[in-house]
Regions:
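Beta-strand-turn-beta hairpins that frame and shape the catalytic cleft
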Residues: 143, 177-181
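Acyltransferase
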Residues: 184-205
Length: 205
């Protein structure tokens, strides 16, 4: 069962519809009780780093989420801001992230992206998988394209945690992984068959 954490941010319906079309069992969890039987977890998110963490805390699901991911090693993939809150800190906010993949979230201008490039980085972009993704990008090694909408990127403390890169003025990590925790900066639920393949791969990890 794929469980999508519904804490008030993200395209929950889009994930559910995509999994339904693939005949993969999926549900939304709005409470800790609904999260309890999760075998795979999708942690979506849009908006701001601090706001996402505040809503996750307010949902009452964070303690059980930590228990399942950190203690029980249940696979989880964070999407967009759901990926960013996997980090320790963000230049966008003051709060402490989940810290599941050590690193910091930086603004694109921090890596000297030319001012001629508009922000947010919005639209389709090529993605280059790297070793270590443990199958998340299976079948997507060539010609993978995903939909992005963001102004911040994930800077891993350990470069080995990067499992895919994209380029927007300069290369940046668009997917990360450590153990049973993955994060993708792009939106697989908006990325048509590329996104469907990635979400199916996650269901089969």
């Amino acid at each position: 069962m794929i469980t999508i954490v519904d804490y008030g941010l993200g395209n929950i319906g889009a994930f559910l519809n995509m999994y339904k079309r693939m005949n993969v069992a999926a549900k939304a969890a709005r409470t800790a009780d609904e999260l309890a039987d999760a075998e795979r977890i999708v942690l979506p998110g849009v908006g701001a780093f601090d706001h996402a963490l505040e809503l996750l805390d307010a949902s009452g699901m964070r303690p059980l989420l930590e228990e399942k991911v950190v203690g029980d090693k249940v696979p989880v993939v964070g999407v967009c801001v759901g990926m960013q809150i996997l980090a320790d800190t963000s230049e966008e906010g003051q709060g402490r992230g989940l810290g599941w993949i050590p690193g910091a979230v930086r603004h694109f201008r921090s890596m000297q992206v030319p001012n001629s490039l508009p922000l947010p980085h919005m639209g389709w972009n090529d993605v280059e998988p790297l070793p270590g993704d443990a199958g998340l990008f299976r079948g997507l090694e060539r010609d993978a394209r995903f939909y992005f909408l963001h102004s911040f990127y994930y800077e891993c403390a350990d470069p080995a945690d990067r499992v895919a890169v994209a380029t927007y003025g300069a290369p940046f990590a668009c997917a990360v992984r450590r153990g049973n925790v993955w994060g993708v900066q792009f939106h697989p639920e908006k990325s048509h068959h590329f996104g469907a393949m990635l979400l199916k791969n996650f269901a089969e990890l």
